[in-house]
Amino acid sequence: MIVRERVDGDLDGCVDALAQVHDCDGYPNMWPQNPHRWLSSPTVVKAWVGESDGRVVGHVAVDREVAGAPTTAGSIAVSRLFVHPHARGNGLSGALLDAVTDFAAESQLELVLDVVEDALPAIALYERRGWVYVDERLADWTRTDGVRPVERRYRLPR
C-alpha cells in the first residue's frame, strides 16, 4: 500500500472504490448525483489516495467546508475518507489520516471533521488517533428514510 497525492486520472478508481464502500457501509449516506464532482468539489484543497497493486483502494481530502459551512479561520476539514472493503485492516485509513495531518501541520492549520453518530468504526478510529469530540448537531440533510442524522464534530489538537 502506498499513499500519494490524488491526480485527475485517479477519479475513476476513486468512484469505483466509493461504490463498493457505499454498497457495504452506506457511505456516503446518499449516493452523489455526480460522484466525480463530489470527490473534487471546488472547496477541496488537496486529496490523497491509497493504492495497492496499481489500483485506488482508499481516499481522503481536506476541504474548506465542514458540514456544508466554511471552516473557521486557521482550520481545514478532513473529508471523503474511505477505504475499499477488501483493503481494510492494514492501516490504510491511518496512513491516509497521517497524510492529512502532515499537510495541516506544514500549513499550520487545525484539523476538524464531522461524522454521523452511527458511524461507529470511523468514530473509534478518530478517537484512537487523538481526535477530541467538540459537539453534535442535527445534519442539514436527510437520509433516504427521511431522518436527519446527528453529526458529531471533532478536532485534532495541534
Stretch-by-stretch model annotation:
Residues 1-9, 152, 156-158:
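Conserved N-terminal entry element of GNAT/NAT acetyltransferase domains
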Residues 5-86, 94-99, 103:
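Acetyl-CoA-dependent GNAT
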Residues 45, 148-154:
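Short hydrophobic/aromatic beta-strand or adjacent loop that forms the aromatic wall/cage
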Residues 84-86, 90, 117-118:
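Active-site acidic-Proline motif in GNAT/NAT acetyltransferases
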Residues 94, 118-135, 144-147:
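Conserved active-site alpha-helix within GNAT-family acetyltransferase domains
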Residues 104-115:
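Conserved GNAT acetyl-CoA-binding A-motif
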